[in-house]
Amino acid sequence: MHSEYYFEQAIEQSLTTVGGYVKGNPKDYDPRLALFPKDVVAFIQETQLKKWVKIYNSCKDETENRIVNDLAHALDTEGALSVLRQGFKCFGQKIKMAYFAPNTSINKTIQEQYDANIIKCTRQLHTEFNEIPDMVLSLNGIPLITLELKNEFSASGWNVEDAKIQFKKDRNAKGRLFEFKKRTLVHFAVDTCEVYMTTKLDGENTFFLPFNKGYLNGRGNPPVEGDVRTHYLWTETLARHSFMEIFARYMHL
């Protein structure tokens, strides 16, 4: 894993094999809307077909465009967290954009709705400013988390500090993907030893918090036999159920 490419690949493989994710196609990303329209459409058709049909009866062949554009408008005005929790309106229909974990598994319908969430890991998409984040995690077509990954054992020798610099200098905080609250809500700077996070990109003023477990009463993470020290980020924190819980219960902006 002594290169950033293989580090990135290993994280993707973990998320898509045991983490409950689907591998995303960067070509499916629409930089104008900062959405994955195909996933938006697939999720709504799968979980809210009756509402889709009602909108279709009014919009016909423009149904997909109308729904996706109304979603983009809601995200721009209400913010991603509000839309995930409260939904958005389109042609008089209240559309949900996420189904969170039920308190009990007794209700089969609610469990099926929860299982229908489309969670994807997409590498190397291109934004409208031709930025190429290492990895973007999305829920039902809405990008929510970005990761910049560095491997200090690679030829470049870049580490988590370089990832933080990349967020500060090379990511447009006013761009569609990165603008505060409107799409992505968490940004992780990661290497094989440490993780830092922020919820708001603000150029040189971006403030990162450590997202480490600590080691010997100090910073960092304990060594892990057969894996890198930061593996908990993708095997625990970002695994499907934990990912959903972050946006259902724990995030406040």
Named regions from a protein language model:
Residues 2-253:
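ATP-dependent helicase/translocase motor core
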